[in-house]
Amino acid sequence: MAISAWMPLLVALIVVWISAAEVDAQVPGPRTRYQPNWASLDQRPLPQWYDDAKVGIFLHYGVYSVPSFGSEWFWTNWKNLRNPEYVQFMQRNYKPDFTYQEFASQFTAELFNATKWALLFKDSGARYVVLTSKHHDGFTLWPSKNSYGWNSMDVGPKRDIVKELAAAIRKESDLRFGLYYSLFEWFNPLWTDDKLHLLMQQHFVERKVRPEQMELVQQYLPEIIWSDGDWEAPAKYWRSEEFIAWLYNDSPVRDTVVTNDRWGFGTACMHGDFYNCADRFNPGVLQAHKWENAFTLDRTSWGQRFDVSLSDFMTSKEVIKEIITTVSCNGNVLINVGPTKFGTILPIFEERLRDMGRWLKFNGEGIYGSVPWIYQNDTINGNVWYTRQKEASNGKITIYAFVLEYPYDTNELDIYPLGKDINIFRNVMLTGIDMGTGGDILNEQSTEVVMLGMEDTKIKWNADHNRLHIVFPPKNHIDKRGLDYAWTFKITIT
């Protein structure tokens, strides 16, 4: 039936519930100071921009882009693990005494155009970008003072890739710029010596890691610090709590910066503004703490490679599904592409990003700034996922139902946005909809159904209590609008 007279109280209860679940973020207070320990750092509210953004682009770019074989772990797979495929690849294609360092001079990036990249990411519908400033091979994409002769200014491109991309992103778009930074380096002698001393000394952290972390933040002002390569040492060795406390308290990005959860073994899914937990993490159920699903369009490698076939790439439909299922459960997506050594992005990656941008242009209303609904996945139809508008304003609640599979057989769909088996307490307390009076809850007087992208087309629908029966517009009309991959119904209840 209609919204209860005690709607204001119930709306307040919705806000309390969401806040308790850490779904809605807040801007941290400018004078709050955090101590260098997890108990204090974990109290920091998540900056609102990150929760609203939902979609980011990840870039794995570096010397490993030169051999373009296997994955970005090329060096250690070849020299450390002695993987036969990598060993044979080198034997077939390079002289016997060839070293990984020699790839750096071939990392030319002569076609790298930061403006072109920025415009593509803007068109993709992403709201933030994260670039690998340094991967596990230790090569930096900026002229690090602590990586002499092993950075993009001294060898290879002879350019500050980080600086150029940061400037272009900020000039050409409203996207936020972030940096990935690997803590450990496979073959750095300072790191290997610290390990030989059972991590009882921290020479690598003191002389390499901490100076570079500070340099990156102070010079390039990244609003995402995406830490990695942490798992071989505890956070105390990396002095992670000290660094994060400085980020939150005194850094030039203290009010807006966000960090992930890779700060030493045991920190994953435990500490950080958002949790990655693992690569390609997508639990499919609501998570209380903000999280991020980092996945790569090439299913196997994060770096660009040529030993790849079409089936190794995610389809545009799969990308859209990953966005929907992640955002419905309180996550963001970080979608990775690997540029070529020349500085170009392969057409297949560009196609996926532009397809995503077109889809978000029509359906982004249900993605950006949304929060989870009381149900993430439809009770009966597993191909339907839900989000809702953040605020229940003007006595209205707006739900978005994302349909992943088109009902070709009937052109009709039954969904249960309020749940099939009504739990009066749960639904009334979380929605403000009084379900205890019987009769139709969803009706023409209290409910409006619109298909995003076809707002000018009246949608035929009817309801039986909590079941909503929707008739799609003719498929050829939908196709003419360029609506593909997944279809969104906006359900407004007053």
Curated annotation (Swiss-Prot):
One GO term of the biological process aspect: defense response to bacterium
Recorded catalytic activity of this chain's protein: an alpha-L-fucoside + H2O = L-fucose + an alcohol
Pfam family, one: Alpha_L_fucos
Annotated glycosylation sites: 113, 377
Residues of the signal peptide: 1-25
Gene Ontology terms, MF aspect: alpha-L-fucosidase activity; fucose binding
Keywords attached to this entry: Glycoprotein, Glycosidase, Hydrolase, Signal
Entry GO CC: lysosome; outer acrosomal membrane; sperm plasma membrane
EC number: 3.2.1.51
InterPro entries reported for this sequence: FUC_metazoa-typ (IPR016286), Fucosidase_C (IPR031919), Glyco_hydro_29 (IPR000933), Glyco_hydro_b (IPR013780), Glycoside_hydrolase_SF (IPR017853)
Gene3D superfamilies according to UniProt: Glycosidases, Golgi alpha-mannosidase II
This protein's record includes keyword Hydrolase: yes
Purpose of the protein: Alpha-L-fucosidase is responsible for hydrolyzing the alpha-1,6-linked fucose joined to the reducing-end N-acetylglucosamine of the carbohydrate moieties of glycoproteins.
PANTHER family to which the protein is assigned, alphabetical: ALPHA-L-FUCOSIDASE (PTHR10030), ALPHA-L-FUCOSIDASE-RELATED (PTHR10030:SF37)
Protein family membership: Belongs to the glycosyl hydrolase 29 family.
Protein name: Putative alpha-L-fucosidase
Source organism (scientific name): Drosophila melanogaster (Fruit fly)
